[in-house]
Amino acid sequence: MEKNKPLELALDLLKHSNIVRNNEYRFVTPDFGIVISFTHMESRLFRLGQPYRLKEGRIIRGLRGKARITINLIEYNIYPQTIATFLPGSIIELLEFTPDCDFQLIAADKDFLPLLRGDQLFESHTRQNLVMQVTDTEWKLSDAYFTLIWGTVQEVPFRREVVQHLLAALLHNIKYIRTEEANDTSRRFSHQEEIFWRFIALVNEFSKNERTVGFYADKLCLTPRYLNTLIRQVSHQTVMEWINQSVILEAKVLLKHSNLLVYQISDELHFPNPSFFCKFFKRMTGMTPQEYQKR
């Protein structure tokens, strides 16, 4: 694959690999895809410890085993009977998984859903609650949706409108589950935790350009000192540690999956000069940018 931009885990990857339809385990079009068993598909898309950017939104159902991942800096575990939704543009990194790990996946472009802009429907899922362990009843219902969508895509010709509406219904149902969780007082976030999640969203959005505590404090209408204290109390990390992690994540994506030179990546990430970027990268990772590229 030509390295001309940061690699996105996109439906295009499967399309360019001449994998358009596999009746046994997967079905893919330019703007919609479903995988009924990732293990049996024998995909080699993922490498441990390598960040990727998601082009389309994703729905994941954990079937067996366990996977440990990070989504936009935050670590999650995918267990059996887990449902996860990942927003378009998210950066995902697979940290580890058990040999028996298997899951199902639906990916859809933002323009695929007919009744509502697809990105709005995915965005309606709260950023701090991307992964849920669901009840037996909700798990069976999600299985019914996946089974119905899978059965529908086997029909010829492709029943696009039917799949669009089934997917919209599935996303709305997941939204209902999240709403119930949000109304559960035992799971409700504290005021400090709410600020933390707002801070993380801001870091993911602005860290390429803004790397001062004051910027994020202003956005949250707090003093820099109070923000630093609050973030440390909630996460056991400082504001700058979170910002630096976000910058490193973006740098890794650019180093591995673009044809940009190191000095161009330094400019892209708004470092004063390449030397400063290289020192920062080595301090954070223990290796130079060039060494990371060659791994």
Task: List each language-model region with its residue ranges.
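Short beta-strand His + acidic residue motifs that chelate non-heme Fe in jelly-roll/DSBH
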Residues: 68-70, 86, 92-97
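…primarily DNA-binding HTH/wHTH and HhH modules…
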Residues: 278-295
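A hydrophobic/aromatic-rich effector-binding and dimerization subdomain
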Residues: 2-4, 19-25, 94-151
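Generic protein-terminus/edge-of-domain signal
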Residues: 1-66, 76
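Short hydrophobic/aromatic patch on the recognition helix
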Residues: 81, 227-228, 276-277, 281
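Terminal helix-turn-helix DNA-binding modules in bacterial transcription factors
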Residues: 233-275, 294-295
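Short, Lys/Arg-enriched, Trp-marked, Pro/Gly-tolerant hinge/linker segments that flank
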Residues: 133, 156-161, 174-201, 205-220, ...
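Short acidic-glycine-tyrosine-enriched beta hairpin
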Residues: 73-87
